[in-house]
């Protein structure tokens, strides 16, 4: 589902954006900066809003798309996040960006598209909370070898995970691995998981094929 809206700017008689203080000063233009500095300013605004809503900011990116920017915000929580929650976060982030621009000037120079979503199945598991939130899923991961052994690939089901290690069930049995021993994990798509009947959770599994489970977009 994608819900789109448009935020309007004050315009003059010609329909172009009204300049409230003559030509933009060199200092104001420099606030646009490069993508890295814009991302840093966005992070300052967005992360507190997402945290206050009770979610984790998993990723924040900004890129060019023609004549506008695309701001992508990925959020998650224990138990996942549904479309209604994504929409709530999208509105809160949009309002915070509006307020920040009123107070501090352009956060993102020019028009931009705001996209808020939950992580898709393609998101690599790099933090303890990523592994914890994927308990029960089949994961493929690289096990780092020691000085006398090379890396190897391992496929196993996530049994449990804490801040120190993850326990995986493999064909060889159950074993715990510290995160330092593992590379990023990759969730493997399954049509039927153990303990599920065919078709019982088909609607849930269909979402595994999307890069983002739920997306809320707003054009600005």
Curated annotation (Swiss-Prot):
Give start-end positions of Acidic residues composition bias.
198-220
Which CDD domains does this one have? YlxS_C
Species: Salinispora tropica (strain ATCC BAA-916 / DSM 44818 / JCM 13857 / NBRC 105044 / CNB-440)
Q: Which Pfam families match?
A: DUF150_C, RimP_N
* Annotated function: Required for maturation of 30S ribosomal subunits.
HAMAP family the UniProt entry points to: RimP (MF_01077)
Q: Name the UniProt key words of this record, in alphabetical order.
A: Cytoplasm, Ribosome biogenesis
Compositional bias of kind Low complexity = 1-15
GO cellular component, as recorded: cytosol
Q: Which gene encodes it?
A: rimP
- InterPro entries reported for this sequence: Ribosome_maturation_RimP, RimP_C, RimP_C_sf, RimP_N, RimP_N_sf
Query: Into which family does the record put it?
Result: Belongs to the RimP family.
Q: What is this protein called?
A: Ribosome maturation factor RimP
- Statement: the UniProt record of this protein carries the keyword Cytoplasm: yes
Biological process, per Gene Ontology: ribosomal small subunit assembly; translation
Q: Where in the cell is it found?
A: Cytoplasm
SUPFAM superfamilies registered for this protein in UniProt: YhbC-like, C-terminal domain (SSF74942), YhbC-like, N-terminal domain (SSF75420)
Chain residue ranges for the region called Disordered = 1-35, 184-220
Q: Name the predominant localization.
A: cytoplasm
Q: Which Gene3D superfamilies match?
A: RimP-like superfamily, N-terminal (3.30.300.70)
């Amino acid at each position: 589902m994608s819900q789109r809206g448009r935020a309007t700017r004050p315009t003059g008689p010609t329909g172009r954006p009204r300049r409230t203080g003559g030509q933009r000063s060199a200092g104001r233009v420099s606030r646009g900066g490069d993508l890295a500095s814009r991302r840093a300013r966005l992070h300052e605004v967005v992360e507190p809003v997402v945290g206050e809503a009770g979610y984790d900011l998993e990723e924040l990116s900004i890129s060019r798309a023609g004549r506008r920017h695309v701001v992508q915000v990925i959020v998650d929580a224990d138990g996942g996040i549904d479309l209604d929650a994504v929409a709530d976060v999208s509105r809160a982030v949009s309002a915070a960006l509006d307020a920040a621009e009123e107070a501090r000037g352009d956060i993102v120079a020019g028009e931009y598209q705001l996209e808020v979503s939950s992580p898709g199945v393609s998101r690599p598991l790099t933090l303890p909370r990523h592994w914890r939130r994927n308990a029960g899923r089949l994961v493929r991961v690289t096990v780092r070898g020691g000085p006398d052994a090379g890396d190897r690939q391992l496929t196993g089901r996530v049994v449990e995970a804490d801040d120190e290690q993850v326990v995986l069930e493999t064909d060889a049995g159950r074993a715990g691995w510290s995160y330092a021993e593992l590379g990023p994990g990759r969730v493997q798509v399954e049509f039927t998981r153990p303990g599920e009947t065919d078709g019982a959770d088909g609607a849930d599994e269909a979402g595994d094929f999307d890069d983002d489970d739920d997306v809320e977009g707003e054009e600005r």
